[in-house]
């Protein structure tokens, strides 16, 4: 009998809901839906208007037909950090209790205000001969997480787990057999996360305060139009591009390169930092997120990063028979990866 799980991604402009069923024959995406949020409901990953968010989620549940009330929640904000650290070895039974003390000096915020997790992937002996555990330390502001959980549960759902969204997405897309590190670029409305894994293990996560909204603002400035018109123009490009003459295409390329320059530069800086500190570069990158389909983004990233860059799609490739045309279209877009990854519980 197939078992289903539900992933819920709360972004700054959109909430996405995915139901994935699993059986011996594999995983199947059964339903995939989203709803837009009004500006100011969620700002940079922080819930500002809990009532409006709950209302949007209730409406999404009505149309999204999730496979149950239990959801795996994905969150990301500027008040969350994830970094590779070496911690002193502690017996496994004592580790959870000891983690706040071990991590206190490694965080940019008070440890007592945080929810902590540690993804260990290597036991080793350091240069001083001490036994240490290497892994990814994840910290999130506790009140920020609770605000999101409360809004979700006020909509009639039960949150069974909370995951830093980039980690669940990475788990759904990463190739554990890749001989080289891989980068996942999740480009949202106001934030972009950069995650790098090696052999399926997350080694690096950085959250940037730039996203699709910044691309639109740069376009508006370059084209001397307001941001609403710039957003409409940006979204129409996949349709209008093939009909443009050579001069218009050249002007469009210039506009997009200008609009993408700051975001692409920040992404390159983050990947260069990883390459310098670890002594190896990612062999390829995948792009997901609501702004991941921006025209020109992939070739510009590939040129600047000097590695292959492709749209990221979850390992689940089978779609349920009851999926609508809109759901199938969403399943093929880079925006779907996070919600599906959460439903898979891959983090």
Regions found by a protein language model. Give the residues of each.
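Non-catalytic, solvent-exposed interaction/assembly segments
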Residues: 1-102, 146, 156-158, 180
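A short acidic Gly-Thr/Ser loop motif
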Residues: 2, 8-15, 76-78, 184-192, ...
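Glycine-rich phosphate-binding loop plus the immediately following alpha-helix
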Residues: 143-171, 201-242
């Amino acid at each position: 009998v197939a078992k289903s799980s539900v992933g819920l991604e709360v972004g700054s402009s959109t909430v996405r809901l995915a139901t994935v069923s699993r059986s011996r024959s594999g995983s199947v995406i059964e339903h995939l839906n989203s709803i837009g949020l009004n500006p100011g409901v969620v700002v940079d990953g922080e819930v500002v208007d809990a009532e409006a968010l709950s209302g949007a989620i209730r409406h999404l549940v009505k149309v999204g037909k999730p496979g149950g009330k239990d959801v795996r929640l994905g969150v990301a904000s500027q008040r969350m950090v994830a970094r590779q650290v070496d911690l002193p070895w502690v017996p496994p039974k004592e580790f959870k209790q000891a983690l706040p003390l071990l991590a206190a000096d490694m965080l940019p915020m008070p440890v007592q205000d945080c929810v902590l997790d540690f993804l260990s992937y290597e036991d080793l002996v350091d240069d001083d001969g001490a036994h240490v555990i290497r892994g990814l330390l994840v910290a999130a502001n506790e009140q920020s997480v609770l605000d999101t959980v409360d809004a979700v549960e006020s909509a009639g759902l039960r949150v069974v787990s909370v995951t830093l969204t980039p980690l669940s997405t990475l788990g759904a897309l990463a190739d554990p057999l890749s001989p080289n590190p891989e980068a996942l670029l999740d480009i949202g409305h106001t934030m972009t996360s950069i995650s790098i894994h090696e052999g399926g293990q997350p080694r690096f996560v950085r959250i940037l305060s730039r996203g699709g909204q910044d691309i639109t603002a740069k376009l508006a400035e370059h084209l001397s139009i307001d941001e609403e018109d710039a957003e409409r123009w940006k979204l129409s490009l996949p349709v209008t591009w093939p009909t443009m003459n050579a001069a218009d295409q050249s002007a469009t390329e210039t506009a997009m390169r200008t609009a993408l320059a700051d975001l692409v530069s920040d992404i390159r800086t983050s990947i260069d930092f990883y390459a310098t500190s670890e002594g190896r570069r990612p062999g390829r990158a995948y792009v997901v997120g609501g702004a991941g389909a921006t025209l020109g983004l992939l070739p510009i990233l590939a040129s600047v990063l000097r590695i292959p860059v492709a749209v990221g799609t979850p390992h689940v490739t089978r779609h349920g028979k009851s999926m609508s045309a809109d759901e199938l279209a969403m399943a093929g877009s880079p925006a779907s990866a996070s919600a599906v990854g959460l439903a898979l519980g891959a983090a």
